[in-house]
Amino acid sequence: MIVRPQQHWLRRIFVWHGSVLSKISSCLLLNFLFSIAVIFMLPWYTHLGIKFTLAPFSILGVAIAIFLGFRNNAGYARYVEARKLWGQLMIASRSLLREVKTTLPDSASVREFARLQIAFAHCLRMTLRKQPQAEVLAHYLKTKDLQRVLASNSPANRILLIMGEWLAVQRRNGQLSDILFISLNDRLNDISAVLAGCERIAYTPIPFAYTLILHRTVYLFCIMLPFALVMDLHYMTPFISVLISYTFISLDCLAEELEDPFGTENNDLPLDAICNAIEIDLLQMNDEAEIPAKILPDRHYQLT
């Protein structure tokens, strides 16, 4: 995620980091060079009686813009839902530890439970990003629990099970009443709902055929556009063609980024920072001495 302070409108025009321009610059360069080639080809295909007009491109451009808008809205809806889910995880984690800490007197046992919660947040983050987990989870889990988690097809769900087992032990030992156990178990169910929601987004992409149709249409439109512009604009064709192509290709590229909000690209959710915030909050609630430093945006204003 790009966390950039407010800038003057003129400076914002030339912003590079955080823009999709770095991804599509090669496409725009090819479009510019192809437009120059079309200028030199103009006498040849005019001699053949071939004439392109702007009318069909105007109609097609409007249609593409509408469907790109629909696709970007769908991608942004996934992004917003993903952020809401991680917000719910933060709320449920704080509430669960608060209830456990104010109910159970054993600080050592509560510390173990807090580390299970932190491990869950990091495990969910790394699962969604398809990152190796053993090294990070080893800081929070016991050896036997770590082995169970790493052997599971759903590591985050396994940690939830271990948390449920921990609550069950406290109940059998008489530390928790049935009412408190049910209340705390409901918190675990809230966290489980977050896990299922994140998996739903991560494993259900926007239908490929829909994406492919738009992608093909956008690039074919940008390839054919110089032939229609050159009749009226001539030497200005490369510049106008690149400007129009930038609008369509950048929207197509941005939609691809928003489709998977859990990645590590510029416009994805800052899961590292969210997990860091959860860890800091839970450790401070438990009066821990060693608190990790808060993750801040880098020099390019990117928060991962």
Give each language-model segment a name.
Residues L33-I50, V218-F248, D252:
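Juxtamembrane "helix exit" motif at the C-terminal ends of alpha-helical transmembrane segments
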Residues Y210, L225-A228, M236, F262-N266:
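Long amphipathic all-alpha helical oligomerization modules
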Residues L10-S22, I179-L180, D186-T217, G263, ...:
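Membrane-interface, cytosolic juxtamembrane amphipathic helix immediately N-terminal to a transmembrane helix
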